[in-house]
Amino acid sequence: ALTALEKQSIQDIWTILKAVGLEFLQVKMFGKLFADHPEYKAHFDNFLTAIFSVAEDLVPKLRAHLHRVIDAFDLVIFALGRESLRGSLKDLGIFHTGRDIVDPVESLTGFKLMVAVIEEGLDTFRAVPEYSKGLEGRFGNVDNINENAPFR
């Protein structure tokens, strides 16, 4: 189980990543997903068509879907340590599995993807003095955070 500080650290890093921009974060997440699991592209055919053909009617749908994905990750991350949100998390899981659009293996892949993006974000921010200083103010030495990250 994660300690309270570890949970808060994950939430703080996610908040910093989101501040950079949702579209950047979404592109990172889906880019990594498709690089690691090209077989999942079939689930997103219409959205990928929108990206490559810039079909005007599909682009808003893609953007809306990507925002829903980020919102789902928000729910999971900010539910850490909050018993009151357990029901919402359960409903989110039931929604996906009930529609047969996500199986348990894919769900685990999604969480691993989220962890990888958070880790990459932390590495990126360590290289930017302003962010690194801010992280150190919150967590102490940033290098120790990365080495001892609860999500490694």
From Swiss-Prot:
Record keyword Heme present: yes
Organism superkingdom: Eukaryota
Designated name of the protein: Extracellular globin-E7
Transmembrane segments: none
Positions with a binding annotation for heme b: H96
Species of provenance: Artemia sp.
Alphabetical list of InterPro entries matching this protein: Globin (IPR000971), Globin-like_sf (IPR009050), Globin/Proto (IPR012292), Mb-like_M (IPR044399)
Ranges for domain Globin: 1-152
